């Protein structure tokens, strides 16, 4: 007998908490769990005791790495929270959680406003069409500036963000907030850990400013809502309910972003922000239908949240749990699923049995017998399912689009210390690459050396740490290497001819290919322009395949060749001696022959680097960036410090943390985000080729 769902769909919220590292995201999540009754003692990230940060590495580093899914209850709503990491090395976790969320809370540091990683996650949320509210946190800190933070949303993100509250005081005097919709003040009692506050009329000294700001709020809503605009221009009274309904509609349409103020650490303002989550963020019924594909016909199928429809869910995270083993986090889009039943993994076309279903709460769990549309839960027993796989009713297979996985930019070699470590390391790498698609491991067949690659130094440090802690692998780690790429800068035509005719069956393949540079990020494209069968149909896929295989090893220094178009336009064949293998080799020869004419260059990853430093060290810091081949993009003031925005090649950033610490006496900080690939200067290209024993394409 099927269970009934506990919370109706319109009372369900699936939200993520997104932020730059150190904006106070984990503390904010903690407080949500505390006030919604899930935690009895508050944990602080900087003391290494937070409910959400449940992996050992996170406890040590005080940063959130794995998006733990947690269920909480606020008033009569269920809120599922996906805790997303704020560190740039873990953007796959953020992308992954944005895929399964319906709405998000963006947390800003009131001193800093919008920071580089805020820009990153904001852009990702735009890509996935996720409505957001903003929580300006750390209002208790010296230098906190609510208005400047709101302004940074306009200036740096071009967002129509407007305060729905104004803070009462700031830094030491921050004591609560004024609600600009209902025009009341919520003032906190210092002694009651934020669980008690008084709602009072707006104090006289704030009345004039509050009315001015309420008017600004109405004007901002009127810009995106015709009904409010008509009333506003006509001088009619706008009721609180009308204003809230208009804000909800505009927020769901991504035209408006309500902004709240508070201090999670000092337990102020979190409950009002939770009211914002239920008032303005979408339920699964409010979001656009999720588009899936029928694997048989390729037709698009729209998935509406409905328990009666066939089951369809996305596996968005695999975790290795110390208590239950392999845990698959799923988001149910439609239908329902009982524990013990079978599902079809439509991505791999294999049947899997769901043993148990768990509702997750940071690192504790409750077993449940059934999940419904809109739910987020952990499933045990799915052996072959990996991140991004579609799980569906066996009678109704559907493919939900998979996640876009960025390529790694950095790699290091790992050498196990003993034969026993080698075996353990193989198991560890298999599990870790399953969990995280941006982490790759490969063994060089010639040298036997294992290389791991990822999104940054911190990313790889943490993976090595996990191998040691979870799998007892002792290994030596090499120097970090940059993931260079190669590309063509000019058009070139080249012949590739492979002939072996010495008794017996020979080999014959002959092709003419035109290579042209492709747009950045477009990758490799193949065009078949053969007329009159000069290269027979059956050999054309081999030419394409031969090119792709040859491109993996590049033409200059063995790095993958990217962003190139290849047009096969002529060639010849031999009735007897031509084969798929011969045409594969011919294609690779054409690529090699084109290299010198096509202006082959080595590309290097360029990082967007933001350095924050006290003014007295500014000269040293700027000098150091220039010395690292950096280009300045601009500078701004922030809370008594200078913030330098620049672009620097990744190869020049190794060891920068130590340099910055010593040149600013530990007071400077920096963040870096991969931005684009760019050709290396000639002298550096020559060095790279020399080191790799490649050939110069002069």
Swiss-Prot record:
- Asked whether the keyword DNA-binding is assigned, the reply is no
Q: Which residues bind GTP?
A: 19-26, 83-87, 137-140
Question: Under the cellular component aspect of Gene Ontology, which terms does the record hold?
Answer: cytoplasm
Q: Which UniProt keywords apply?
A: Cytoplasm, Elongation factor, GTP-binding, Nucleotide-binding, Protein biosynthesis
Molecular function per GO: GTP binding; GTPase activity; translation elongation factor activity
* GO BP annotations listed: ribosome disassembly
Which InterPro entries does the UniProt entry name for this protein? EF-G-like_DII (IPR053905), EFG_II (IPR041095), EFG_III (IPR009022), EFG_III/V (IPR035647), EFG_IV (IPR047872), EFG_V (IPR035649), EFG_V-like (IPR000640), G_TR_CS (IPR031157)
Report the subcellular localization. Cytoplasm
Q: Which domain of life is it from?
A: Bacteria
Q: Which family does it belong to?
A: Belongs to the TRAFAC class translation factor GTPase superfamily. Classic translation factor GTPase family. EF-G/EF-2 subfamily.
| The protein's role, per its UniProt record | Catalyzes the GTP-dependent ribosomal translocation step during translation elongation. During this step, the ribosome changes from the pre-translocational (PRE) to the post-translocational (POST) state as the newly formed A-site-bound peptidyl-tRNA and P-site-bound deacylated tRNA move to the P and E sites, respectively. Catalyzes the coordinated movement of the two tRNA molecules, the mRNA and conformational changes in the ribosome.
Name of the protein in question: Elongation factor G
Point out the gene that encodes the protein: fusA
């Amino acid at each position: 007998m099927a269970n009934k769902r506990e919370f109706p769909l319109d009372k369900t919220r699936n939200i993520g908490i997104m932020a730059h590292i150190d904006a106070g995201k984990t503390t904010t999540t903690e407080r949500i769990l505390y006030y919604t009754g899930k935690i009895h003692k508050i944990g602080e990230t900087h003391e290494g005791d937070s409910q959400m940060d449940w992996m050992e590495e996170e406890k040590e580093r005080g940063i959130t790495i794995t998006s733990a899914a947690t269920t909480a209850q606020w008033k009569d709503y269920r809120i599922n929270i996906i805790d997303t990491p704020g560190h740039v090395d873990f953007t796959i976790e953020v992308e992954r959680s944005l895929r399964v969320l319906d709405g998000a809370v963006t947390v800003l540091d009131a001193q800093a406003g919008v920071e580089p990683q805020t820009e990153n996650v904001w852009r990702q949320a735009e890509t996935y069409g996720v409505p957001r509210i903003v929580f300006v946190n750390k209002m208790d800190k010296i230098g906190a500036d609510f208005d400047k933070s709101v302004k940074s949303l306009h200036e740096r993100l071009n967002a129509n963000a407007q305060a729905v509250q104004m803070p009462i005081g700031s830094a030491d005097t921050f004591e609560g907030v004024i609600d600009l919709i209902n025009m009341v003040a919520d003032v906190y009692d210092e002694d009651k850990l934020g669980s008690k506050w008084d709602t009072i009329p707006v104090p006289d000294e704030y009345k004039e400013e509050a009315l001015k700001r309420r008017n600004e709020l109405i004007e901002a809503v009127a810009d995106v809502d015709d009904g409010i605009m008509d009333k506003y221009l006509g001088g009619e009274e706008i009721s609180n309910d009308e204003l809230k309904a208009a804000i909800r509609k505009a927020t769901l349409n991504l035209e408006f972003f309500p902004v709240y103020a508070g201090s999670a650490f000092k337990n102020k303002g979190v409950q009002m922000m939770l009211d914002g989550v239920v008032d303005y963020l979408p339920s699964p019924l409010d979001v656009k239908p999720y588009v899936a594909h029928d694997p048989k016909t390729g037709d698009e199928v729209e998935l509406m949240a409905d328990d009666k429809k066939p089951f369809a869910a996305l596996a968005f995270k695999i975790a290795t749990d110390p208590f239950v083993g392999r845990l698959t986090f799923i988001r149910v889009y439609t239908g329902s699923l009982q524990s013990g039943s079978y599902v079809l993994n439509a991505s791999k076309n294999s049947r899997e049995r769901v043993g148990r279903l768990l509702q997750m709460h940071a690192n504790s769990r409750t077993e449940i017998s059934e999940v419904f549309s809109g739910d987020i839960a952990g499933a045990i027993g799915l052996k072959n399912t990996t991140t991004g796989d579609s799980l569906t009713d066996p009678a109704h297979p559907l493919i939900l689009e998979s996640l876009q996985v960025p390529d790694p930019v950095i790699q290091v070699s790992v050498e196990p210390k003993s034969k026993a470590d080698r075996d353990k390391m193989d198991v560890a790498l298999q599990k870790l690459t399953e969990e995280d698609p941006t982490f790759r491991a490969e063994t060089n067949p010639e040298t036997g050396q294992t290389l791991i690659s990822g999104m940054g130094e911190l990313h790889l440090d943490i993976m090595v740490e996990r191998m040691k802690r979870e799998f007892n692998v002792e290994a030596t780690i090499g120097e970090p290497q940059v993931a260079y790429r190669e590309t063509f800068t000019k058009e070139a035509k080249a012949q590739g001819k492979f002939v072996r005719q010495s008794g017996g069956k020979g080999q014959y393949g002959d092709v003419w290919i035109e290579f042209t540079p492709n747009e950045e990020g477009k990758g490799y494209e193949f065009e078949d322009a053969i007329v009159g069968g000069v290269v027979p149909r059956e050999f054309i896929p081999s030419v394409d395949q031969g090119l792709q295989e040859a491109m993996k090893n590049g033409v200059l220094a063995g790095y993958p060749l990217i962003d190139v178009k290849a047009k096969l336009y002529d060639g010849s064949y031999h009735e007897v001696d031509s084969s798929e293998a011969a045409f594969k080799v011919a294609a690779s020869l054409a690529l090699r022959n084109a290299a010198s004419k096509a202006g082959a260059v080595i590309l290097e990853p360029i990082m967007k680097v933001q350095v924050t430093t006290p003014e007295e060290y500014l000269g040293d810091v700027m000098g150091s960036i220039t010395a690292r081949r950096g280009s300045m993009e601009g500078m701004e003031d922030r809370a008594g410090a200078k913030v330098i925005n620049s672009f620097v090649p990744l190869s020049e950033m190794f060891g920068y943390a130590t340099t910055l610490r010593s040149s600013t006496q530990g007071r400077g900080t920096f963040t870096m985000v991969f931005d684009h690939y760019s050709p290396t200067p000639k002298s550096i290209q020559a060095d790279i080729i020399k080191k790799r024993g490649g050939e110069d394409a002069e």
